[in-house]
Amino acid sequence: MNTYLYASPPCILNNIERILKMLISLKDHLVKTTAIGLLLGSASLATPVKAESSLEGNIGFTNNYVWRGMTQTDDQAAISGGLDFSAGGFYAGTWASNVDFADDTNSEQDVYFGFAGDAGDVSYDVGYIAYMYSGGDDLDFSEIYISVGAAGFSLTYSYLVDADYDADSGDETYLALDYELPLSGDFGVSLHYGIYDKDSETDEQTDFGMTISKDDFSLTFSQVDDEFFANDEDMKIFVSYGIGF
């Protein structure tokens, strides 16, 4: 697992170069492997089948990595990178970023897979995601999720299926409602409201926010009402930039 730490401009440049080299190398390798597999498979079939698939990489920068309203980098910058493969509605991918928790945890890597598609005017997505952390103990966890969307709205339900940090945490859920405003031009505006529930009368966290985007840039305002940790978080305002390849 790679660790990307935010420290100084030279360190950031080194991390960017390392992430780009890693993702480009992995992408090239997977493309070659997939092409060879398709050639061998078509040679063994009487009727060749055309496989529609894609492999894409991404790298992102933000002055604050915020997840469900909570900073994951102690209000510091983050560099992230990911790789996604999709074919016929099925998809799988991985994503990594630096983090900064109270212990020695300093990096996060996610692995996910699922199936997404459309049924008329309704979109849907069902999948599984595992969150893994290096440098700390008992923080890994995984969720299953289902999402439906229509007319600019999307509703996503996530359910915790496994967690190293709490043996009794199986009832944790997160419900998110998002809305993409129908704007013309290059700008986009989306609204978000989420509820994090630990299946008790007190352990509930809500977060809400707004994101303004243009091209590869986005500006997000995020506020959380946090009962998990019995404190009130200040509004988070952060800028993000992402590129794909």
Predicted regions and their residues:
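Outer-membrane beta-barrel proteins
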Residues: 2-245
